């Protein structure tokens, strides 16, 4: 999860988020090189005593500054398109969970089970236990099995919301009357925190999301205890 004064992304815990981090580093390197080149050229222009007032055209330079940016854009666009297609890919999910946004809490339904659903509210600051996180803890966590493909169906009962968990590279809009879907898979167990990422009213900041990723055998025990 995030920590105070953090500058980078949260640690990736899903293949998609790992791809997004690699793409971010790849793009940032290109932007840094371009910025350095532009600053270098500007510094030369400001410090040189040479002038070229008689130069009318320079086709070679024009060709270079047309082709080079096109190549750079292609180098950025190709990996970006690859990740976009990966994010929309659905691979026979092992479990489906329906998420509904409300003002101002989330409700979850495990559609593969006959009667497994619950609401998830933020725990008020006055009721937190030692070690728990302010504005991020909930009374009912979403328990999911790790290393399995899980489909999340996301919608809303009232206004626009957005279901987002940064460590998993997830952000899906919850739109009234529309059912969006996304897939997730965690490569390691743990608690992963998120929040509503669409301004939805006065208590928008009080809609945390907590995923608890556990091995399959522990998930089966939990689901049996909830039925």
UniProtKB/Swiss-Prot annotation:
GO terms for cellular component: mitochondrial inner membrane; respiratory chain complex IV. One of its GO terms (molecular function) is copper ion binding. Mg(2+) binds at residue 198. Gene3D superfamilies: 1.10.287.90, Cupredoxins - blue copper proteins. Its main location: mitochondrion. It is a multi-pass membrane protein. It is found in: Mitochondrion inner membrane. Keywords: Copper, Electron transport, Magnesium, Membrane, Metal-binding, Mitochondrion, Mitochondrion inner membrane, Phosphoprotein, Respiratory chain, Translocase, Transmembrane, Transmembrane helix, Transport. PROSITE patterns: COX2, COX2_CUA, COX2_TM. Pfam families: COX2 (PF00116), COX2_TM (PF02790). Residues 46-59 are mitochondrial matrix. GO terms for biological process: ATP synthesis coupled electron transport. Its cofactor is Cu cation. It catalyses: 4 Fe(II)-[cytochrome c] + O2 + 8 H(+)(in) = 4 Fe(III)-[cytochrome c] + 2 H2O + 4 H(+)(out). Its EC number is 7.1.1.9. The chain crosses the membrane at residues 15-45, 60-87. The modification Phosphotyrosine is found at residue 218. Cu cation A1 binds at residues 161, 196, 200, 207. CDD domains: CcO_II_C. Component of the cytochrome c oxidase, the last enzyme in the mitochondrial electron transport chain which drives oxidative phosphorylation. The respiratory chain contains 3 multisubunit complexes succinate dehydrogenase (complex II, CII), ubiquinol-cytochrome c oxidoreductase (cytochrome b-c1 complex, complex III, CIII) and cytochrome c oxidase (complex IV, CIV), that cooperate to transfer electrons derived from NADH and succinate to molecular oxygen, creating an electrochemical gradient over the inner membrane that drives transmembrane transport and the ATP synthase. Component of the cytochrome c oxidase (complex IV, CIV), a multisubunit enzyme composed of 14 subunits. The complex is composed of a catalytic core of 3 subunits MT-CO1, MT-CO2 and MT-CO3, encoded in the mitochondrial DNA, and 11 supernumerary subunits COX4I, COX5A, COX5B, COX6A, COX6B, COX6C, COX7A, COX7B, COX7C, COX8 and NDUFA4, which are encoded in the nuclear genome. This is Cytochrome c oxidase subunit 2. The gene is MT-CO2.
């Amino acid at each position: 999860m995030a920590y105070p004064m953090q500058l980078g992304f949260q640690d990736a815990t899903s293949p998609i988020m790992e791809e997004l981090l690699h793409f971010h580093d790849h793009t940032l390197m290109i932007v840094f090189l371009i910025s350095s080149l532009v600053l270098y050229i500007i510094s030369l222009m400001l410090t040189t005593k040479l002038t070229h007032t008689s130069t009318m055209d320079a086709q070679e330079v024009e060709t270079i500054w047309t082709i080079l940016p096109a190549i750079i854009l292609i180098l950025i666009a190709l990996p970006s398109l690859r990740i976009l297609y990966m994010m929309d890919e659905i691979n026979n999910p092992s479990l489906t969970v329906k998420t509904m946004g409300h003002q101002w809490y989330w409700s979850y339904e495990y559609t593969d089970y006959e009667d497994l659903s619950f609401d998830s509210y933020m725990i008020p600051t006055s009721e937190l236990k030692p070690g728990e996180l302010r504005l991020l803890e909930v009374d009912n966590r979403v328990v999911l099995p790790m290393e399995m493909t899980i489909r999340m169906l996301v919608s809303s009962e009232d206004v626009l919301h957005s279901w987002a968990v940064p460590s998993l590279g997830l952000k899906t809009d919850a739109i009234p009357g529309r059912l969006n879907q996304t897939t997730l898979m965690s490569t390691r167990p743990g608690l992963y925190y998120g929040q509503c990422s669409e301004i939805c009213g006065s208590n928008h900041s009080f809609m945390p999301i907590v995923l608890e990723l556990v091995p399959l055998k522990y998930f089966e025990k939990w689901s049996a205890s909830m039925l």
